[in-house]
Amino acid sequence: MYTQDRFMSPQYKARFKGYVQVTKPGIIFGNLISVAGGFLLAAKGDVNLALMLASLVGLSLVVASGCAVNNCIDRDIDAKMQRTCKRVTVTGEIAVGNVLAFGLALGVLGFSILALFTNALALLFAVIGYIVYVGVYSLYMKRNSVYGTLVGSFSGAVPPVVGYCSVTGQMDMGAAILLLMFSLWQMPHSYAIAIFRFNDYAAANIPVLPVAEGMTKAKLHIVLYIAVFALVSALLPLAGYTGIAFMAVTCATSLWWLAMALKGYRHGVDIQRWARQVFGFSIITIMALSITMALDSQVIKEQVIGQTNLFTLVK
């Protein structure tokens, strides 16, 4: 009874909630969708459920680890930002050492699952993405360079590639397109956040593009990155990895997103509201494309099988 009462106590619940929060569940969920999208794109309907589960769980734990360690690294700048000043690593509700140990334990478990159940290439991408996010981005680039977002975009693009390579075991054109596509998506998504959270980033002296070089340049970069993202996304169907459904969805979402970005140049536009709209639609775009590429790749496989069967009959 004592043990049960202890686990049900408000203090225990608050501590448990704190440990969950440092892993950033929203980010984990978004990465789960992209991992599944990359995996199913490569599988083309021939899904190994055990392998898929291992990829999803392993990568989720790696992402959770990176987020927890990032909370420890960023606690000084988090204290200066309204959005993050209540994090447990800032308030001291949970000791930083405990959060760090928790994060590293999650990483060991996640990498172990990927090592045991996927393949060397998937594991390698996960390791590189982790090192870039924790070691390069969080420890140095985020604080010291306007190019921090660009570096961070690589680690954000790794999850779908891990999912894809878990199936194929090789770095082919499909994996390269995914890596480039998701890296490009990260840029306008992140710049939009930096605009509507401008005061926070300025208070913490983080040199994101809007703070370091102004809103005009940030708006231009958002438009340019969305335009290039649209072109790169179209490479998946053009290269035969997906079909017409993906092409239709990528054209519709990318053009709508681009049109939304161009509204930032309207006279008298509410820049904060505009940035939130660009950010919100960036999530809709990447979710729609992740789901569509997973489903549309199955159609491609069925078409290939049908053509093969027809060829066999004619022969």
From Swiss-Prot:
Converts heme B (protoheme IX) to heme O by substitution of the vinyl group on carbon 2 of heme B porphyrin ring with a hydroxyethyl farnesyl side group. This is Protoheme IX farnesyltransferase 1. Carbon 2 of the heme B porphyrin ring is defined according to the Fischer nomenclature. It comes from Shewanella sp. (strain W3-18-1). GO terms for cellular component: plasma membrane. The keyword tRNA-binding does not apply. One of its GO terms (molecular function) is protoheme IX farnesyltransferase activity. The gene is cyoE1. It is an enzyme of class 2 (transferase). PROSITE patterns: UBIA (PS00943).
